[in-house]
């Protein structure tokens, strides 16, 4: 019957001021009489220095908790199970009062728990050093701390502070783990206690062995008397030693069981009804005591001293060997039986040692006959099982190494297969063991007939039995190891199933990277590679065109959103457009120069040109000496709706007279042929023609590229210039008085424009709606123009130099020489104007 752990082992009463000794025994303070040693472990006086016993706070807490009485209901003052406790009201309630008093909505926020869940705080809830309530728990020192303790700790040590709730959960987990270990320790010690108790109960076997010994010794009185006395003394001595050892170990185990029960009871109370603060304060002490108890060990079981007739006969055979000639090799081996069969697999197989003493010839004779036939039924399958077991053992060992050392991923099916094979071998070994047991009856008859061979056959038989036991134990261990690997393998496979998609499948490459990989994977001269490169270039070109279209659309939208300012209109009678779309005839004549002074009808909604551009064009017009008197040929200009609405208004011209003067050829411009010999009356009057000629010269000097290709855009023509030209045409070229006044106004506007060019501003004018509507109605307009103007002045020095030099004229030199001629002409013109 188990004792109450809250009772003293000396006075057999409940603890009063319990104290704890270093051996983990707890007694009353008055029972110890101030002795530093425990009377339970050592009843006599102890000469060794022991630690001073300390008050047992854990036992005191259990005593206080065990004496706690259930509180009455605060409303009806009765105890009716089940009982509840309202933490908000701090009152106990029965079931009826709870339903009556806490059903209103105002009590819905009250926290009501059962009385079993309520934990009363028996220890202090305030800090001993600062008298402040506990707010945190330190996991390093395993103590509760207040706000002052927290502020007093340095910053690098504050990482160990956790909340009381987290500390409570952590301590409960540790207590559960320690209690589980302690329960296992208790079960082992209880089993050892029962084994030793059974050994004491088998004392009657010694008397039977003594009687059989006397009967055997009577057969050989003279020789065996000495052996008898010796064996009897040894038996008595073994019995005394066994009894003494068992009694001593029983006392040790019983002494350990008391603290074990106390610690288990403490763990149960702390995990169920103890408050959080009590658990946090008492958990370190309980952990320490449990660790001390787990470190205690008990001596091994004594060797069984139960006499065996076979052992006695072997000793007698040794003593009678000089007389009877019996060798000890004919006697069976002595099997020492231990209390625990767990070490049986550790004993080495003695069959090889025993067989080494026998010759091959004797072994062949012993295995012949009926015994050999019976034994062959087990021997051959057993050898096969040994090979299979060795293979499976090696596989399990390699699997365990892959799992623990090599960190490999093992399939669950492989482990299950190993488990099945181990179970199969274990079943086969069990069947062979049963077959061996069944052979014993048949072998007894053979042993009776052949006494000399029985000894050797018994040796072989017993060794095989031991070998089977060893193999079965090994198979059990392998099976246990294989079963232990199953959850780990399942866990690893589950984790691998989650990680494998991310680890095995690389991310998709970018579109350009995939295209490049596809292109590089194709052979250099293959048609697929060429098509892929062309496709990529086409896509890139389309993307660039789309970007340009978007930019142009944005610019046009921004231009449309701008408001047009009101500016003065400038009318110039000599404002003309030069068509640079040249078509050279075989004789070198540019048909586009037949009517270079085409008047353009500009819409009132078009943007005005800057003053600087207008001035530059006026100077060029004066240099080329354009006059309306020389216009003889008539050119019809048709203005289309599309051209009229564009920013650079173009005219489709229909020439009535195709006879034109030839332009100077490229050889003349380069100086190879005298330019003066080929000068016609209509060369040089077109600015576009001159620029086109220069472009031809430059193109000959260097290959055409997008950078050196020049594009000349046509200028917008003022509407006033067009109207003046129409009036001059209708009035036979003579300006009227109103036209003269309008020309004077235009000159004034030009002067104003010149002053505005200094500010670099673009002047816009507001367009009237009526003018726009009127201009839109006139879709096409036909104009007639005069003959082209005379050839501009070109200094003779340029042609002389060109004719003298045999070198080719470079691009830069050609530009410089033409510009010098233009500057010389401008200076001469300015000098003539100043003289006038």
UniProtKB/Swiss-Prot annotation:
Biased amino acid composition, Basic and acidic residues: 540-552
State the coiled-coil residue ranges: 527-557
Ordered alphabetically, the record's keywords are: Coiled coil, Metal-binding, Repeat, Zinc, Zinc-finger
Which stretches are zinc fingers (B box-type)? 68-115, 122-164
Q: Where is the composition biased (Basic residues)?
A: 561-571
Can you name one GO molecular function term for this protein? zinc ion binding
Span list, region Disordered: 540-571
- What domain of life does the UniProt record list for this protein's source? Eukaryota
Q: Where are the zinc fingers (RING-type)?
A: 8-42
Example GO CC term: the record gives: perinuclear region of cytoplasm
Residues noted as binding Zn(2+) in the record, renumbered to the chain: 73, 76, 97, 102
Q: What is the protein named?
A: Probable RING finger protein 207 homolog
Q: Which organism is it from?
A: Caenorhabditis briggsae
């Amino acid at each position: 019957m188990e004792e109450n752990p809250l009772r003293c082992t000396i006075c057999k009463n409940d603890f009063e001021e319990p104290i704890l000794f270093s051996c983990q025994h707890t007694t009353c303070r008055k029972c110890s009489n101030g002795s530093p040693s425990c009377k339970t472990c050592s009843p006599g006086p102890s000469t060794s220095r022991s630690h001073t016993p300390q008050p047992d706070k854990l036992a005191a807490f259990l005593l206080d908790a065990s004496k706690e009485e259930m509180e009455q209901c605060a409303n009806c003052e009765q105890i009716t199970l089940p009982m509840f406790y309202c933490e908000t009201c701090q009152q106990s309630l029965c079931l009826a009062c709870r339903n009556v008093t806490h059903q209103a909505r105002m009590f819905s926020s009250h926290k009501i728990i059962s009385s079993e869940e309520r934990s009363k705080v028996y220890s202090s809830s305030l800090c001993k050093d600062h008298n402040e309530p506990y707010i945190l728990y330190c996991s390093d020192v395993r103590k509760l701390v207040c706000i002052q303790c927290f502020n007093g700790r340095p910053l690098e040590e504050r990482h160990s502070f956790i909340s009381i709730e987290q500390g409570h959960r952590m301590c409960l987990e540790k207590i559960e783990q320690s209690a589980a270990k302690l329960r296992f320790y208790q079960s082992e010690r209880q089993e050892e206690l029962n084994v030793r108790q059974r050994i004491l109960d088998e004392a009657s076997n010694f008397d039977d062995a003594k009687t059989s010994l006397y009967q055997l010794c009577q057969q050989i009185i003279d020789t065996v008397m000495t052996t008898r006395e010796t064996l009897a003394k040894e038996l008595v001595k073994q019995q005394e030693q066994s009894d003494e050892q068992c009694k001593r170990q029983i006392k040790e185990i019983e002494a350990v069981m008391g603290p074990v029960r106390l610690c288990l009871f403490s763990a149960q109370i702390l995990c169920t009804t103890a408050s959080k603060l009590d658990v946090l304060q008492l958990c370190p002490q309980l952990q320490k005591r449990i660790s001390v108890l787990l470190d205690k060990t008990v001596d091994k079981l004594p060797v069984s001293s139960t006499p065996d007739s076979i052992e006695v006969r072997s000793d007698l055979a040794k003593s009678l060997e000089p007389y009877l000639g019996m060798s000890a090799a004919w006697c069976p081996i002595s099997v020492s039986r231990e209390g625990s069969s767990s070490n049986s697999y550790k004993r080495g197989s003695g069959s090889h040692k025993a067989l080494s003493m026998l010759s091959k010839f004797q072994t062949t004779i012993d295995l012949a006959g009926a015994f050999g036939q019976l034994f062959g039924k087990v021997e051959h399958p057993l050898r096969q099982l040994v090979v299979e077991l060795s293979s499976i053992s090696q596989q399990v060992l390699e699997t365990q190494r892959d799992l623990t050392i090599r960190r490999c991923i093992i399939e669950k099916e492989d482990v299950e297969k190993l488990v099945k094979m181990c179970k199969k071998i274990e079943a086969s070994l069990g069947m062979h063991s049963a077959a061996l047991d069944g052979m014993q009856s048949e072998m007894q008859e053979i042993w009776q007939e052949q006494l000399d061979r029985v000894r050797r056959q018994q040796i072989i038989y017993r060794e095989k039995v031991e070998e089977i036991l060893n193999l079965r134990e090994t198979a059990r261990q392998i099976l246990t190891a294989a079963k232990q690997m199953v959850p780990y393998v399942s866990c690893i496979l589950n984790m691998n199933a989650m990680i494998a998609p991310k680890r095995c499948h690389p991310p998709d490459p970018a579109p350009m990277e995939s295209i490049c990989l596809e292109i590089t994977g194709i052979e250099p001269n293959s048609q697929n590679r060429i098509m892929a490169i062309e496709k990529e270039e086409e896509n890139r070109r389309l993307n660039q065109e789309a970007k340009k279209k978007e930019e142009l659309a944005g610019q046009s939208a921004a231009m449309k959103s701008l408001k047009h300012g009101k500016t003065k209109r400038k009318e110039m009678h000599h404002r003309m457009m030069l068509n640079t779309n040249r078509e050279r005839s075989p004789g070198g004549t540019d048909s586009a120069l037949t009517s270079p002074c085409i008047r353009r009808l500009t819409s009132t909604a078009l943007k005005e040109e800057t003053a600087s551009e207008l001035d530059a064009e006026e100077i060029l017009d004066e240099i080329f000496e354009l006059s309306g008197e020389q216009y003889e040929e008539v050119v019809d200009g048709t203005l289309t709706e599309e051209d009229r609405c564009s920013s650079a208004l173009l005219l489709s011209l229909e020439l009535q007279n195709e006879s034109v003067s030839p332009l100077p050829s490229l050889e003349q411009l380069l100086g190879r042929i005298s330019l003066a010999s080929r000068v016609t009356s209509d060369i040089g009057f077109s600015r576009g023609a001159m620029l086109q000629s220069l472009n031809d010269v430059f193109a000959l000097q260097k290959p055409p590229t997008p950078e050196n290709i020049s594009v000349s855009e046509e200028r917008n023509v003022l509407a006033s210039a067009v109207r003046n030209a129409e009036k001059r045409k209708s009035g036979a070229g003579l300006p009227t008085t109103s036209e003269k006044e309008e020309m004077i106004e235009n000159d004034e506007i030009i002067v104003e424009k010149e002053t505005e060019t200094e500010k670099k501003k673009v002047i816009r004018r507001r367009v009237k709606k009526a003018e726009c509507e009127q201009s839109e109605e006139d879709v096409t307009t036909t104009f007639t123009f005069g003959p082209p103007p005379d050839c501009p002045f070109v200094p003779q020095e340029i042609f002389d130099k060109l004719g003298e030099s045999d070198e080719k004229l470079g691009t830069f030199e050609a530009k410089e020489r033409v510009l010098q001629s233009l500057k010389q002409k401008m200076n001469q013109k300015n000098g003539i104007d100043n003289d006038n």
